[in-house]
């Protein structure tokens, strides 16, 4: 995977994100459908995903829509096999959805989603 061109990496991760969303259990799938999920080709060392916005139920109707960014090149570089990449994309997506649902890092770690 690391030898692929950057746009191929982004396309691959976009497909994996779509597959992950389709197979999420409720209520995670419904939460994912409320979010703008973007796959970015920027190489961000040590950062696979980022949640930006106000967590669900925290109020502030004036806030921008909640967004998750998945960093395709960082994931592809660190997880070169398809199986490892598929697993990590799903794990990253679930982790960031957890932030949207109001979970902090210790909550996520307690659920095995660090």
What are these regions, as identified by a protein language model?
Residues 52-90, 100-114:
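Active-site scaffold of zinc-dependent metalloenzymes
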